[in-house]
Swiss-Prot record:
GO terms for cellular component: cytoplasm; ribonucleoprotein complex; ribosome. This is Large ribosomal subunit protein eL8. GO terms for biological process: ribosome biogenesis; translation; tRNA 5'-leader removal. Belongs to the eukaryotic ribosomal protein eL8 family. It is found in: Cytoplasm. Multifunctional RNA-binding protein that recognizes the K-turn motif in ribosomal RNA, the RNA component of RNase P, box H/ACA, box C/D and box C'/D' sRNAs.
Amino acid sequence: MESYVKFQTPETLEKAVLDMVENSYKTGKVRKGTNEVVKSIERGESKLVVIAEDVSPAEVVYYLPTLCEERKVPYVYVKKKSDLGLKVGIASAASVSIVDYGKNDDAYKSIVSQINDAKSGKSENKE
């Protein structure tokens, strides 16, 4: 596990997050790439940040979890940047920011709740 990964994401949550990323991408409400993600967080546009665990060098995304915590933006990890990239129409993506999740309000609330559970360690017993 990379040093910037602060908690493990359960597989069911990862799948739900990737589905939401894909649906949000179809509406054009996703920022891809670390620079765009940082801008969306700093502008207060970001609703959810997704960070790949296999980014090399780690410094590319190392500060994103801290920035998200400072700005109170939920964030989550996915195992592979290639999986994340596939959902947003590119080969790989180190990070993605959802700026509008559309009509997926219930799914968004569920994902944020599961992220909070994963951060507090509650999800470890469910796997």
